Amino acid sequence: MIPDASSCCSADSISRAKQILALIPGRATGAYSHSQGIKGLRDAIASGIASRDGFPANADDIFLTDGASPGVHLMMQLLIRNEKDGILVPIPQYPLYSASIALHGGSLVPYYLNESTGWGLEISDVKKQLEDARSRGIDVRALVVINPGNPTGQVLAEENQYDIVKFCKNEGLVLLADEVYQENIYADNKKFHSFKKIVRSLGYGEEDLPLVSYQSVSKGYYGECGKRGGYMEITGFSAPVREQIYKIASVNLCSNITGQILASLVMNPPKASDESYASYKAEKDGILASLARRAKALEVAFSKLEGITCNKAEGAMYLFPQICLPQKAIEAAKAANKAPDAFYALRLLESTGIVVVPGSGFGQVTISLVEISRKTNI
């Protein structure tokens, strides 16, 4: 027997559920929606973006997707015509980007985050890589920035973001802003600023800079990976280009309705005046505090280990320590026909049962590892 909703749910959550159902044609989640997603849900997301940034947002700029990944693939399909089209990607990199670029036949143009400055993004290096690629006949079309960083866990300084936006404008690049960890900030001296906010703060309008911003329900404090909800917000594109984006999105008909609903809830959560707010805030704060404790515990533990250096845990869900292996271990790895960090990771697994990911899998050239811990509560 289904209990009366009022006996187990707050009045505002019941009201929100009714409002959402009213937005869906037929009041059911089993039918197709508009290819960009249900208009009322996009309105809710636009409202959340505007509240976050302090600048207006338009529901027509929002494409709801099955997580952020399909939005990345869509833009790669749009941007890449052949192997001479390049995309600037940070190294260490989230493998989604290299895989998507390869899938669509383009060229990955790496730029290297500076480990000695907390995995900082240095415009001088990005410019060097851009010029080198252009000298080889590669038409570099976009710059990917992941903030907070995956797999490096850094949070970009606001001043650095201004430099990035100006660089993209001057060089005629599309800015692809992966912001799916925007809620995961652990350093007291760091704050998330969306690139949309940075662009508008500079006074740039629709004619100045093409920007694609990604968000997902898989990360943050919600972590609903299997629900496959997310969106991309596109601004600064001409009408003919927007038409092509819509055509590509239409090929997949629409994203799943449950994920669309979750994306709207993530960007438009309970307000302080709502009955459910205290419960929502307690759970949110508890999850983020637990993630911060785990990040700090690992950071401190790594700093005490001989031969290991690790930057501070600022955001996302990752630490990226560097392991200095002795020459004998490097020679043993070579004899086993394995990369030194992969050799170390396998030996660690065999000896302790601890799973780490070799840094070389993220394009890192030094002997580094990523350790990800999300399950143990501290």
Where are these regions (language model features)?
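PLP-dependent class I/II
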Residues: 1-36, 40-378
